[in-house]
């Protein structure tokens, strides 16, 4: 049996030209590994935005979620690390399919090898702004306040923020490239 890893699918992201095609590609990959997989570890940002309200989960991702359920029903362990885009994943996936949610980095022995696992934002804390936002997002009171806002508003806001953040990051990368800062 094998253990598989995947990260940063950003399902539902507005920067994907065809979000459904990305989801279908991920489902095809899961289909291709289901015969020999004993566990699948998703290392964060499965979704571009995920917030679980008490009785509401995000629209979409049906093929992917159905495939996860199928794999879990086959006895394949599903591990999901929280990323900075799906930080508000709570108990829906553990209750529905038995997924194991990891909120922090983890050192684990798998098949006789030691791994340090987590999402990248859990490893690199250089940005003070990111640390502040992360603390706000993880604060129970702030989560409670946010949950009081209708999903119609929060989802549009979050997906727009994500898209703008990505564009800003790409612009900074291009500026560094232009200035030669990425030269080896």
Segments (PLM) and residue ranges:
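Surface-exposed beta-strand edges and their flanking turn/coil or helix-capping segments
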Residues: 18-20, 93, 114-116, 129-133, ...
């Amino acid at each position: 049996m094998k253990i598989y890893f995947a990260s940063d699918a950003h399902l539902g992201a507005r920067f994907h030209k065809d979000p459904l095609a990305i989801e279908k590609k991920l489902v095809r990959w899961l289909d291709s590994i289901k015969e020999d997989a004993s566990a699948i570890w998703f290392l964060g940002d499965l979704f571009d935005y995920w917030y679980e309200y008490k009785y509401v989960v995000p629209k979409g991702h049906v093929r992917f979620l159905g495939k996860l359920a199928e794999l879990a029903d086959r006895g394949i362990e599903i591990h999901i690390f929280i990323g900075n885009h799906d930080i508000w994943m709570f108990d829906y996936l553990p209750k529905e399919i038995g997924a194991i949610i990891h909120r922090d980095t983890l050192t684990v022995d798998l098949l006789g090898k030691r791994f340090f696992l987590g999402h990248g934002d859990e490893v690199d804390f250089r940005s003070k702004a990111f640390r502040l936002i992360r603390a706000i997002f993880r604060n129970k009171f702030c989560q409670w306040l946010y949950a009081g806002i209708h999903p119609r508003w929060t989802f549009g806001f979050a997906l727009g923020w994500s898209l703008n953040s990505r564009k800003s990051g790409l612009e900074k990368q291009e500026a560094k490239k232009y200035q030669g800062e990425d030269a080896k």
